[in-house]
């Protein structure tokens, strides 16, 4: 479906605005997916979570990590690590022992916190106010003031973000404001699919024609 949609856009000269969340996640994945430090940190977080089960420190355990769309769901895990690092000096001796891996990754945690905070800023700006030359300008300023001042990995991510914004800017008219988020479609379809069948393996192709119907009654 996605490939066919792209072909139609090219065939009929329609401009196609990429979904902001998926696009930013893709850029992060290109930089961090095969990065040794990234893999080590999240592996240790997963091991620590298993060790916390049924112990007195279980209330401090990290959030569950997503296997699919991992780079679209980093914020919760990164925020947990950042907060735990800030409070590490207040932990008990046992708690410090269980989460002893965190201080060793302090620099990396700060790096990831800056990345996900920047992504959060861009997503909020775009989803609340739409994609426009004004919101693009605000996002550019934020990227240049934050992750472009970081290390080599952060600058690679930031450069990809800036390139993406420049490409989207070139498709916009001066006063044009467009939607570049598929959240509404995904939520509507996800709710309908769950109601139709809680089985996650249930095929979705036969349900596609029902979408116009549910959308037509959405506001009634």
Labelled PLM ranges:
Residues 2-11, 18-220:
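Acidic/histidine-rich catalytic cores and adjacent linkers
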């Amino acid at each position: 479906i996605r490939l066919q949609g792209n072909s139609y856009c090219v065939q009929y000269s329609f401009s196609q605005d990429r979904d902001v969340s998926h696009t930013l996640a893709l850029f992060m994945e290109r930089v961090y997916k095969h990065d040794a430090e990234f893999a080590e940190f999240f592996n240790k977080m997963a091991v620590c979570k298993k060790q916390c089960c049924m112990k007195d420190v279980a209330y401090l355990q990290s959030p569950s990590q997503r296997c699919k769309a991992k780079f679209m769901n980093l914020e919760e895990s990164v925020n947990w690590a950042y907060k735990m690092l800030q409070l590490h000096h207040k932990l008990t001796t046992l708690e410090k022992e269980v989460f002893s891996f965190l201080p060793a990754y302090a620099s990396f945690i700060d790096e990831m916190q800056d990345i996900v905070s920047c992504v959060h800023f861009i997503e909020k700006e775009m989803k609340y106010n739409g994609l426009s030359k004004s919101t693009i300008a605000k996002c550019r300023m934020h990227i240049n003031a934050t992750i472009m001042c970081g290390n080599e990995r952060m600058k690679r991510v930031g450069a990809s973000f800036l390139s993406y914004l420049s490409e989207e800017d070139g498709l916009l008219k001066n006063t044009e404001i467009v939607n570049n988020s598929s959240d509404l479609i995904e939520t509507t379809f996800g709710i309908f699919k769950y109601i139709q069948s809680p089985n996650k393996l249930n095929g979705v192709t036969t349900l596609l024609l029902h979408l116009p119907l549910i959308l037509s009654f959405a506001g009634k």
